[in-house]
UniProtKB/Swiss-Prot annotation:
Residues 272-285 have a biased composition (Polar residues). The keyword Membrane does not apply. This is Putative B3 domain-containing protein Os04g0676650. Keywords: DNA-binding, Nucleus, Transcription, Transcription regulation. Signal peptide: none annotated. Residues 1-11 have a biased composition (Low complexity). GO terms for cellular component: nucleus. It comes from the Eukaryota. The lineage of its organism: Eukaryota, Viridiplantae, Streptophyta, Embryophyta, Tracheophyta. Residues 1-30, 225-285 are annotated as: Disordered.
Length: 438
């Protein structure tokens, strides 16, 4: 029977049961829960101003305890998960038979693993083959599809051949991969310098030369368009034409310059400066005779000792004013005229620019474009510049003469004929060497 507080008492004990109920449970049996709830409400201070008052309709006591800043944190009981051991099945390396090497790939590709559909959770029967048990290796973590573990034996085996397995699970050329299974270690592509290119070429680079761009004078034979492709095995053997290159003695053809080629490049200001020796003619006295010019017609009209400015890089020789105005053509304009003068020593015609400069109500006559003549004859400061003029044709002959040092041999120019008795014979200049006396 229940008492006023809601506690039950046994019929045998009577008041003793009630006494035990009051002593054992007190306020927590029957109406004790109601009193305990109101006791907590009285002990908890009112919430602070501005703090959110959390009211939970189902568990008000828990919400009040959560608002109290001094309430201890009660850890929630957590059920401990059972320990599940992790198993990892490593692939078993399969040792390949010795007869299955590069040349045996065609036979391997014909052997198919048993097509198998999982049924009743029964593992597939063990079928021995040339690669032993590939399924153990395929059950490894490296070859398992997503969502399966190594412990799961329900694996769907495809129609697994050597060609399909290598094309679906790994690169075609396993030499350049960072990881490869140990079971296929013997099936690498052949090395770069191996000689098994007829069976499995592997990695190789072909070099082809379609055009014969080797010069004809080269010791190396030209490569025609029908040349074969050079594989890596041929390249590793070294140069093929080394011995032929050492034995060949190919010489370049001599370079020949023709005078007609040089004359086509010269202009009016820079005539041909190539010295051409003239076959000397001998007179009765045995002296060299220059018969290109008739010495009876030519006489000296100008003689100038060269200065530093005359032999400089400017290429200009200042003419003596008296001789220039007396024997050279008269100038009416400052720009001047072009004078053609034959070289006395060489078969060359020089084109000089003859002009004047105004100088204090006077004129200074110059002969320009003389740099080539000075260099050709090797003239220096102190050497002599001589001009001859024909009395009949009016042509000019120019001559450069080296300065005569004391006690040195100097050339003497005379007019001589082949036959002194017959004055109608051709005459020319003769050059004789004499010693200058001091």
């Amino acid at each position: 029977m229940a008492d006023a507080r809601g506690s039950s008492s046994s019929s045998g004990d009577g008041g003793g049961g009630e006494g035990k109920g009051g002593a054992g449970h007190g306020d927590f049996v029957g109406g004790g829960q109601h009193n305990w709830y109101h006791g907590i409400l009285g002990a908890v201070p009112p919430p602070n101003v501005g703090r959110q008052n959390i009211v939970h309709h189902q568990y008000p006591a828990a919400s009040l305890i959560q608002q109290h800043h001094q309430s201890p944190t009660m850890p929630l009981p957590m059920a401990q998960l059972p320990y599940v051991p992790q198993y990892t099945v490593l692939p078993t390396p399969a040792v390949l038979p010795s007869h299955h090497h590069h040349h045996g790939q065609s036979q391997i590709s014909q052997e198919n693993f048993q097509d198998w559909v999982p049924s009743n959770n029964v593992a597939a029967p063990h079928v021995p083959s040339a690669f032993q048990d590939w399924r153990q290796m395929c059950n490894g973590s490296a070859f398992m599809p997503f969502g399966q573990t190594a412990a799961n034996s329900n694996v769907f085996y495809q129609n697994l051949t050597f060609n399909s397995w290598t094309s679906n699970n790994m690169p075609r050329n396993p030499v350049y991969t960072s990881f490869h299974p140990a079971a296929i270690e013997d099936h690498h592509a052949p090395l770069f310098h191996s000689n098994n290119h007829d069976i499995d070429p592997g990695f190789q680079t072909n070099f082809r030369m379609d055009q014969a761009f080797v010069p004809a004078s080269s010791p190396f034979p030209p490569v025609s368009s029908s040349s074969h492709s050079f594989s890596s095995a041929k390249i590793s053997n070294g140069p093929t034409y080394t011995k032929k290159a050492k034995k060949s003695n190919v010489k370049d053809p001599p370079i020949v310059f023709r005078r007609s080629d040089m004359e086509s490049e010269k202009n009016d200001d820079n005539p041909d400066q190539t010295p051409v020796s003239e076959p000397p003619s001998m007179n009765q006295n045995g002296e060299n005779l220059i018969i290109r010019f008739n010495c009876r017609e030519y006489r000296v009209i100008l003689r100038k000792e060269l200065t530093n400015s005359d032999v400089g890089n400017i290429g200009r020789i200042v003419m003596p004013k008296r001789d220039a105005e007396a024997h050279l053509p008269a100038l009416h304009q400052r720009e001047g005229v072009t004078l053609k003068m034959d070289d006395f020593k060489f078969e060359t015609t020089w084109n000089f620019k003859y002009r004047f400069w105004p100088n204090n109500k006077s004129r200074m006559y110059v002969l320009e474009s003389t740099g080539g003549f000075v260099k050709h004859h090797g003239l220096q400061t102190g050497d002599i510049f001589i001009i001859y003029k024909s009395s009949e044709s009016g042509k000019f002959v120019v001559r450069g003469e080296k300065a005569i040092k004391p006690n040195a041999i100097m050339p003497v120019v005379d007019c001589s004929c082949k036959n002194e008795l017959n004055k109608s014979e051709e005459c020319g200049f003769t050059i004789s060497l004499q010693t200058k006396k001091t």
